[in-house]
């Protein structure tokens, strides 16, 4: 009986330790992804293609607010630039080496960009994957929130 009780106590204790480590790992991943998600928005704002190439995978795709699926061609060519880009990650879902981030964005396009000078509110979803030990943005979707 004592052996059974000891086994139960040890099992509960070990399970608690493993869960604690898992929670710490998940918290660290979430913190890293939130940092990268905001860094991505900052690189887009600055038009920093070198930084974006370190964030995006080679096969990165975006379902953009212009109803197109592309490789961020509008950003790469400078057809879309921003005076302001605020991103607020609201939900981070961790599934192994894949993380899905959902939230809202407020952007103000500039120059010859469509809707230049207007404040545009959007919802977004970013999909991050760990590749070769680094978190990279593999896909993104952004939709303009209808104005009333």
Task: Please report, for each region that a protein language model flagged, where it lies by residue.
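A beta-strand edge to alpha-helix "cap/lid" segment located at domain peripheries
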Residues: 21-148
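Bacterial N-terminal signal peptides
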Residues: 5-16
């Amino acid at each position: 009986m004592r052996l059974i009780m000891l086994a139960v106590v040890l099992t509960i204790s070990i399970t608690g330790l493993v869960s604690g480590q898992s929670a710490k790992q998940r918290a660290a991943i979430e913190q890293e992804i939130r940092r990268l998600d905001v860094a991505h928005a900052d690189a887009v704002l600055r038009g920093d293609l070198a930084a974006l190439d370190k964030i995006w995978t080679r096969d990165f795709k975006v379902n953009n607010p212009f109803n197109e699926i592309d490789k961020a061609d509008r950003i790469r060519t400078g057809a879309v630039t921003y005076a302001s880009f605020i991103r607020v990650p609201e939900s981070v879902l961790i599934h192994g080496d894949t993380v899905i981030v959902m939230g809202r964005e407020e952007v103000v396009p500039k120059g010859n960009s469509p809707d230049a000078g207007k404040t545009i509110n959007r919802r977004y979803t970013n999909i991050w994957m760990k590749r070769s030990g680094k978190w990279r943005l593999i896909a993104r979707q952004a939709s303009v929130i209808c104005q009333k």
